[in-house]
């Protein structure tokens, strides 16, 4: 059996006339009759009941016809599907992201991508930068939004593009009554709630380096791997945190976001494999390029 025989069957089933079906198909009647006979032989049952004046579908033919028409429609759609896949208009995009991107670049980037490519399924995975980089290298993700390591020292196989740079702010328990701009040097104690260095070395070093530069000892009282959890621990009064200014959008009872004196700047960017040719990724890169940043 082949697709040609299915088209022959559908034409005869829809016209119930071998002559008209042959005319529709652009062939003569004898080859059409032979094709149907071969199909019936392969199936081991007749599809049509024939008389000299009349052709009608058998019970098998009537029940099989919808399946054949569905299969033919799917086959006919394959060229357009291939073109849409080639152009990145369909398929999927797998994008990982750090929790700090939830309130900065991620929502706008995803919204713009969904508007530009509504036929693409966006698969989002939250993960720390240290988890994202090897996953992207292994081809498990198309791209990731990360906090880059110092000096952007990423593997040579990966490309990187800065998305945003923003100041850090102090996140303090409401009960502290802190007002900005806050100078950590003026505080009696700076108990920190922070990412573990093993999962976020760049962010960890940025925070601890700033605290030390303001003349305070680095005292970490709690660690968590998600920024939302860190904010919750601050609201519980366990300490203070430094967070991207965009996290002000995360309203949480019991915390206060306070500007810092000479705040450190946190960079967030997009990373992907240089040899990754997925059309859906290329669409994302075109959107990012429109923002005017250059890849490293």
Curated annotation (Swiss-Prot):
Entry keywords, A to Z: Activator, Amino-acid biosynthesis, Branched-chain amino acid biosynthesis, DNA-binding, Repressor, Transcription, Transcription regulation
Biological process annotations from GO: amino acid biosynthetic process; branched-chain amino acid biosynthetic process
A GO cellular component entry from the record: protein-DNA complex
Short name of any one Pfam family annotated for the protein: HTH_1
Superkingdom to which the source organism belongs: Bacteria
DNA-binding region residue numbers: 18-37
Keyword match Transcription: yes
MF terms (GO), sorted A to Z: DNA binding; DNA-binding transcription factor activity
InterPro entries, A to Z: IlvR_PBP2, LysR_subst-bd, Tscrpt_reg_HTH_LysR, WH-like_DNA-bd_sf, WH_DNA-bd_sf
Domain HTH lysR-type: 1-58
Nucleotide-binding among keywords: no
Entry-linked PANTHER family: LYSR FAMILY TRANSCRIPTIONAL REGULATOR (PTHR30346:SF17), TRANSCRIPTIONAL DUAL REGULATOR HCAR-RELATED (PTHR30346)
Role according to the record: Positively regulates the expression of the ilvD gene while negatively autoregulating its own expression.
Protein family according to the UniProt entry: Belongs to the LysR transcriptional regulatory family.
Name of the featured protein: HTH-type transcriptional regulator IlvR
Organism in which the protein naturally occurs: Caulobacter vibrioides (strain ATCC 19089 / CIP 103742 / CB 15)
């Amino acid at each position: 059996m082949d697709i040609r025989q299915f088209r022959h069957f559908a034409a005869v089933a829809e016209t119930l006339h071998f002559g008209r079906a042959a005319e529709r198909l652009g062939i003569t009647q004898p080859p059409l009759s032979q094709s149907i006979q071969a199909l019936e032989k392969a199936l081991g049952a007749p599809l049509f009941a024939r008389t000299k004046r009349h052709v009608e579908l058998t019970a098998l033919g009537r029940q099989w016809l919808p399946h054949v028409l569905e299969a033919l429609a799917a086959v006919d759609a394959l060229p357009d599907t291939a073109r849409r896949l080639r152009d990145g208009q369909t398929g999927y995009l797998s994008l990982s992201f750090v929790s700090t991107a939830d309130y900065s670049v991620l929502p706008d980037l995803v919204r713009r991508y969904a508007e530009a490519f509504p036929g693409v399924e966006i698969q989002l995975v939250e993960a720390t930068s240290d988890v994202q980089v090897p996953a992207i290298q292994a081809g498990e993700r198309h791209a990731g939004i990360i906090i880059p390591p110092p000096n952007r020292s990423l593997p040579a196989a990966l490309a990187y593009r800065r998305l945003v740079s923003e100041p850090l702010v102090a996140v303090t328990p409401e009960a502290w009554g802190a007002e900005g701009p806050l100078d950590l040097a003026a505080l009696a104690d700076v108990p920190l709630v922070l990412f573990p260095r093993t999962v976020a070395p760049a962010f960890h070093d940025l925070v601890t380096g700033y605290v030390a530069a303001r003349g305070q000892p680095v005292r970490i009282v709690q660690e968590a791997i998600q920024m939302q959890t860190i904010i919750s621990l601050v609201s519980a009064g366990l300490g203070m945190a430094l967070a991207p200014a965009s996290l002000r959008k995360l309203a949480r009872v019991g915390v206060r976001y306070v500007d810092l004196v000479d705040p450190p700047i946190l960079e967030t960017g997009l990373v992907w494999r240089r040899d990754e040719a997925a059309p859906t990724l290329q669409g994302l890169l075109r959107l990012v390029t429109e923002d005017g940043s250059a890849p490293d």
